[in-house]
């Protein structure tokens, strides 16, 4: 079991139970899944770029990424339905806890000019969305082999009912929010 998952079960969940005033430990919010996605506009002209992005996301997460395709055609962007556009991976269970631990302890401290995560990323149901501008903040990516820095969107889904519960959970897990 991952060290963050162990800490959640032994320390964080009982503390959140008291803080949020719930009667049962099963009502305490917990992580459900983490989704990483990368969308590339240059993949329309050169679909082979997606293979390098799949390799990078697979190295970061430890799980094979899936190539996503355009749902409908948009002529202004020279886009046809079915063209590969991006990469996505959904993490659950131990890989999710491992990624969350590495995100908090290794990746976010390496972001340039980092002053904390904004509070605007919550969706009203306790889930949090954030974006990273560079994939090189993760130690699994070799800086010399990167042809171009690309960003990614990270969605953290929780079982929280509202944003205050979700924020309390993520702060307890070590997410550095702005004051």
Swiss-Prot record:
GO molecular function term, any single one: structural constituent of ribosome
Highest taxon, organism lineage: Bacteria
Transmembrane segment boundaries: none
One Pfam match: Ribosomal_L5
Entry keywords, A to Z: Ribonucleoprotein, Ribosomal protein, RNA-binding, rRNA-binding, tRNA-binding
GO BP, sorted A to Z: translation
Function: This is one of the proteins that bind and probably mediate the attachment of the 5S RNA into the large ribosomal subunit, where it forms part of the central protuberance. In the 70S ribosome it contacts protein S13 of the 30S subunit (bridge B1b), connecting the 2 subunits; this bridge is implicated in subunit movement. Contacts the P site tRNA; the 5S rRNA and some of its associated proteins might help stabilize positioning of ribosome-bound tRNAs.
Assembly with partners or alone: Part of the 50S ribosomal subunit; part of the 5S rRNA/L5/L18/L25 subcomplex. Contacts the 5S rRNA and the P site tRNA. Forms a bridge to the 30S subunit in the 70S ribosome.
Family of the protein in this entry: Belongs to the universal ribosomal protein uL5 family.
PANTHER family according to UniProt: 60S RIBOSOMAL PROTEIN L11-RELATED (PTHR11994)
Protein name per Swiss-Prot or TrEMBL: Large ribosomal subunit protein uL5
Name of the encoding gene: rplE
């Amino acid at each position: 079991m991952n060290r963050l998952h162990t800490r959640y079960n032994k320390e964080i969940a009982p503390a959140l139970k008291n803080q949020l005033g719930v009667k049962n430990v099963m009502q305490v919010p917990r992580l459900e899944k983490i989704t990483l996605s990368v969308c590339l506009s240059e993949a329309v002209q050169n679909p082979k770029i997606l293979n390098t992005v799949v390799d990078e996301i697979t190295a970061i997460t430890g799980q094979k990424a899936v190539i996503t395709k355009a749902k409908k055609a948009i002529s202004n962007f020279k886009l046809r339905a079915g063209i590969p556009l991006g990469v996505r991976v959904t993490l659950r269970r131990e890989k999710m806890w491992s990624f969350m631990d590495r995100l908090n302890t290794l990746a976010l401290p390496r972001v340039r000019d980092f002053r904390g995560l904004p509070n605007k990323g919550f969706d009203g149901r306790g889930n949090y969305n954030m974006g990273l501008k560079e994939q090189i903040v993760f130690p699994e990516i070799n800086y010399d082999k990167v042809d171009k820095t690309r960003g990614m969107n990270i969605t953290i889904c929780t079982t929280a009912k509202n944003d205050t519960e979700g924020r309390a959970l993520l702060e307890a897990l070590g997410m550095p929010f702005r004051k």
